[in-house]
């Protein structure tokens, strides 16, 4: 009975959520697009000409937002191939419905074959921005969930260390709780500028927080 009450309450909140309605109206696949939009408007992360990698991209709302943002710059050059001023590469283990001008690679970004596809798309350039809305399946066991969350952040940090340009940025989702301070410390060891962001589009009941790292530190 309690589970049914929870599901009913969640469905009620979801249906009446203004960001859900806005996403449906504006064609975004998930309300998460507005979390990235708010952070981007505050921190000016997405700019014309960038190479952007979206880790754990499915269903694709973050890639959609990035694509729409880069398309505005491309309007000045209607003949530009691809229709956007920049490159967006989305990666996920799960399939993702195509998005115009977004390159999608399905697979584990730790595998050599996936990295080879990424490097072919990037060419001689380095990545300007890595974004990750990845989240594990939470079990409700605090210690286990904290370890899963930290593991995903570690993967994003390692990917950024290998592929991000020196003045690039990494934005990842994490959750307040056990292990949060360790994740922040790892960001501080890797980036010169670190900030936490809690966009209004993030539900009040949620402990999710986004950590932003800018400007890689040189390896010791």
From Swiss-Prot:
One Gene Ontology CC term in the entry: cytoplasm
Enzyme class name: transferase
Positions of S-adenosyl-L-methionine binding: 60, 62, 92, 108, 133
Stored Pfam families: FtsJ
Keyword annotations: Cytoplasm, Methyltransferase, rRNA processing, S-adenosyl-L-methionine, Transferase
GO function term, MF aspect, one: rRNA (uridine-2'-O-)-methyltransferase activity
Reaction(s) catalysed by this chain's protein: uridine(2552) in 23S rRNA + S-adenosyl-L-methionine = 2'-O-methyluridine(2552) in 23S rRNA + S-adenosyl-L-homocysteine + H(+)
Lineage top rank: taxon: Bacteria
Entry EC number(s): 2.1.1.166
Active-site positions on this chain: 173 (proton acceptor)
Subcellular location: Cytoplasm
Biological role: Specifically methylates the uridine in position 2552 of 23S rRNA at the 2'-O position of the ribose in the fully assembled 50S ribosomal subunit.
PANTHER family: RIBOSOMAL RNA METHYLTRANSFERASE, RRNA METHYLTRANSFERASE 2, MITOCHONDRIAL
Family classification: Belongs to the class I-like SAM-binding methyltransferase superfamily. RNA methyltransferase RlmE family.
Protein known as: Ribosomal RNA large subunit methyltransferase E
Lineage: Bacteria, Pseudomonadati, Pseudomonadota, Betaproteobacteria, Burkholderiales
Gene (UniProt): rlmE
